[in-house]
Design a protein with these regions (language model features):
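Short beta-strand element of the alpha/beta-hydrolase
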Residues: 37-46
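The serine-hydrolase catalytic nucleophile loop
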Residues: 48-57, 72, 168
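Primarily recognizes the serine-hydrolase "nucleophile elbow" in alpha/beta-hydrolase
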Residues: 51, 88-149
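Active-site-adjacent alpha-helix of alpha/beta-hydrolase-fold enzymes
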Residues: 61-62, 160-191, 198, 206
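Conserved alpha/beta-hydrolase
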Residues: 61-77
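Alpha/beta-hydrolase active-site loop
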Residues: 77-97, 220
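Short beta-strand/loop motif that positions the catalytic acidic residue
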Residues: 150, 156-158
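C-terminal catalytic histidine-bearing segment of alpha/beta-hydrolase fold enzymes
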Residues: 185-231
Length: 231
C-alpha cells in the first residue's frame, strides 16, 4: 500500500511539473475549426501585439485549421531562445485534442515574420510551410547565408511601398528572393509575391487597401492547403 501511495504521489508531482512547464511558455490563444479538429496553424503577431491578428486567426480556423495565436514579442527576444520557445508553442498546439497530427503551418507578420523566417523555416521535422507577410528583415546582414538555411517552403508577401520604421522594405525582400533563386536547393522553396504600392499591415481589416486584405488571406490559405496535406 505504501509503495502504491508513493507511486501515486510521484505521478502527481510529475503531472504538476508538466503543467508548470506548459504554463511557462508564451500565452497562446486558440481558434477551433467548426469540425472540432484540424491541422495546426501557428500565427505569430507583429510588434503591435496579438490583438491585431485575431481576425485573420479566425479566418484560418474558418478554413478548417486548428489555429493558435501567439505574440511575436514573446518569441523575438534579445539573447536568443526564441527557437526553443517557438518549438514549445508548436508542441503544445500539437498536443491539443483539437489538433490533427502532422507538421504545422506557420503564418507570421512584421516582427513575427522574423520569428518565422529565422526559426520556423529551419524546422523541417515540425513545420510544413511558412507564410511571412511584410516580415521584419532589417536584421539580415547576409541574405545568401540566411536563405541558405531555409528548409521548408516559404511564401513571402510584401508591399513595395512599405517604409514602416525601415523594418520590412521591399529591397531586402528582393535581395532574399534573388539569393534564393541563386541557390538550387532553396529556389524551389522560396516565393516572393509583391503588392505594388502597398504599405505595412496590408492584411488588416483597418487597412485602406481593402482588396489586399482578402487577397493576402486567400494566398496564405492556398499555401497552407498545398503543404498541410501529406506532411
Amino acid at each position: 500500500m505504501r509503495a502504491l501511495l508513493r507511486s501515486l504521489l510521484l505521478l502527481l508531482a510529475c503531472i504538476a511539473f508538466g503543467a508548470r512547464a506548459d504554463d511557462a511558455g508564451p500565452p497562446q490563444k486558440e481558434y477551433v475549426p467548426k469540425s472540432g479538429t484540424g491541422r495546426v496553424v501557428v500565427v505569430v503577431s507583429g510588434q503591435t501585439g496579438a490583438s491585431n491578428y485575431t481576425s485573420i486567426s479566425q479566418d484560418f480556423a474558418d478554413a478548417g485549421y486548428y489555429t493558435v495565436l501567439v505574440d511575436g514579442n514573446d518569441l523575438w527576444i534579445k539573447g536568443g531562445g526564441g527557437n526553443a520557445l517557438l518549438q514549445g508553442v508548436i508542441a503544445r498546439a500539437q498536443a491539443s485534442p483539437h489538433a490533427v497530427a502532422g507538421k504545422v503551418g506557420v503564418v507570421c507578420f512584421s516582427l513575427g515574420g522574423a520569428v518565422g523566417l529565422t526559426y520556423a523555416t529551419r524546422l523541417p521535422d515540425q513545420v510544413a510551410t511558412v507564410v511571412a507577410m511584410y516580415p521584419l528583415t532589417n536584421f539580415i546582414k547576409d541574405p545568401v547565408d540566411f536563405v541558405g538555411k531555409i528548409k521548408v517552403p516559404v511564401l513571402m508577401l510584401a508591399g513595395t511601398a512599405d517604409t514602416y520604421h525601415s523594418c520590412c522594405v521591399i529591397e531586402k525582400a528582393r535581395e532574399l528572393a534573388d539569393a534564393a533563386k541563386a541557390n538550387p536547393d532553396v529556389a524551389p522553396l522560396f516565393v516572393l509575391h509583391e503588392y505594388p504600392g502597398a504599405d505595412h499591415g496590408f492584411n488588416m481589416n483597418t487597412s485602406h487597401q481593402r482588396a489586399l486584405v482578402a487577397d493576402s488571406r486567400d494566398r496564405a490559405i492556398a499555401q497552407l492547403r498545398q503543404y498541410l496535406v501529406d506532411h
